[in-house]
Amino acid sequence: MEFSQFKVNALMEITARPDLVFVRGQGSWLEDHAGKRYLDFVQGWAVNTLGHCAPEMKRAMAEQADKLMNPSPAFYNLPSIELAQRLTSASCFDRVFFANSGAEANEGAIKLARKWGRVNRNGAYKIITMNHGFHGRTLATMSASGKPGWDTMFAPQVEGFPKAEINDLDSVRALIDAQTVAVMLEPVQGEAGVIPATREFMQGLRKLADEHGILFIVDEVQTGMGRTGSLFAYQQFDVIPDIMTLAKGIGGGIPLAALLAREEVCVFAHGDQGGTYNGNPLCAAVGVAVFDTITAPGFMEAAQARTRQLSEGLLALSAKWSLRGERGMGLLRALVLDRDDAPAIVEAARMLAPEGLLLNAPRGNLLRFMPALNVTEADMARMLEQLDGVIAAVRK
């Protein structure tokens, strides 16, 4: 079937898409309508924890679909209870509210913090966030984000999100006032170019929050669920946040997110928060399967081996092509280029024949890599070899 035969005009135009339609996927590979295969190092922007169509997920979904799909969040269901127990047992948090997307989880975190401020800090509502941070595309989460240009898009913004600089504790300290209720950040700024927070900064934020009696919120929508080398990124900084959000990897490809909080922060009253599909057993059962897979013996050790392979490979390419190095945490990494030809490299990689390569360029001079956590050694080596050839072709 030719691309022109697909009625793509029925879809609302929100981004520039290439002329291809993906029809199937397996592991680290996708196949389009013409039968061409692509090695996928985007994986839905770090969504597909176990790759495409993971057997563990398919099995969990099929078994749950045969039992119960959505009785309404007004009632308890077993998979959501099981997943909540797993998440709290593996973290510093006591309670979980399930949602459907990262933006929805972050909206919940904002609401919970503001409610806590009303109860405990005389109505304090401001949440300090970071320049170049990304927290979602609802009005509140766009306002919380620090992407250039978003301060005027869909204006007026939701008020109450002063911006500090990541890894600059003084910039945070200068913004704290009587109306401040929390500080919120991504442990690794993904859209900004894969910029990790430093250990000193994260620990400084925790200390600053304690000194001023405010909350410390980590947005682990992209960094959580094994992506950065530990189950949750905050665990590598030796800090205890008050609130954490998860999405992307927790569902492994299906819409699932979570808002986690310590007991003393859980101030929602009945009716303060909700959602038609939140914590439905179908998605929660898949979340249990994803959690159990990545916490099984040997899984994270294998992912860490692929992290070393990716980091070393990117450093070798950087040295060969006189680039500016690589950075990141775990299997969320970036190759920093010496010029703004990342979009051209992404395009050339996708156009490779007979098999393409899918990469991401959040900045003109930067490539981001977000493979499945169970990517094979062979597929990692293949990607690095293909990328070397693409750089050569683009820069010839």
Curated annotation (Swiss-Prot):
Q: Per the record, GO CC terms?
A: cytoplasm
Query: Entry cofactor note text?
Result: Binds 1 pyridoxal phosphate per subunit.
What reaction does this enzyme carry out catalytically? N(2)-acetyl-L-ornithine + 2-oxoglutarate = N-acetyl-L-glutamate 5-semialdehyde + L-glutamate
Q: Which cofactor does it need?
A: pyridoxal 5'-phosphate
| Superkingdom | Bacteria
Q: What pathway is this protein a component of?
A: Amino-acid biosynthesis; L-arginine biosynthesis; N(2)-acetyl-L-ornithine from L-glutamate: step 4/4
Grouped into one coarse class, the protein's main location is cytoplasm
What is its subcellular localisation?
Cytoplasm
Name of a matching Pfam family: Aminotran_3
Q: Does this entry carry the keyword Ubl conjugation?
A: no
The biological processes this protein is annotated with in GO are: L-arginine biosynthetic process
PROSITE patterns this protein is in?
AA_TRANSFER_CLASS_3
* Keyword terms: Amino-acid biosynthesis, Aminotransferase, Arginine biosynthesis, Cytoplasm, Pyridoxal phosphate, Transferase
* Record GO terms (molecular function): identical protein binding; N2-acetyl-L-ornithine:2-oxoglutarate 5-aminotransferase activity; pyridoxal phosphate binding
Q: Which residues bind pyridoxal 5'-phosphate?
A: G102, A103, F134, D219, E220, V221, Q222, T276
Q: Has keyword Amino-acid biosynthesis?
A: yes
Which EC number(s) are documented for this chain?
2.6.1.11
Report the residues modified as N6-(pyridoxal phosphate)lysine.
Answer: K248
Q: What class of enzyme is it?
A: transferase
Q: Subunit details for this protein?
A: Homodimer.
PANTHER family per UniProt = ACETYLORNITHINE AMINOTRANSFERASE, MITOCHONDRIAL (PTHR11986:SF79), AMINOTRANSFERASE CLASS III (PTHR11986)
Task: Tell me its family.
Answer: Belongs to the class-III pyridoxal-phosphate-dependent aminotransferase family. ArgD subfamily.
Miscellaneous notes: May also have succinyldiaminopimelate aminotransferase activity, thus carrying out the corresponding step in lysine biosynthesis.
Name of the protein described by the UniProt record: Acetylornithine aminotransferase 2
Species lineage, top-down? Answer: Bacteria, Pseudomonadati, Pseudomonadota, Betaproteobacteria, Burkholderiales
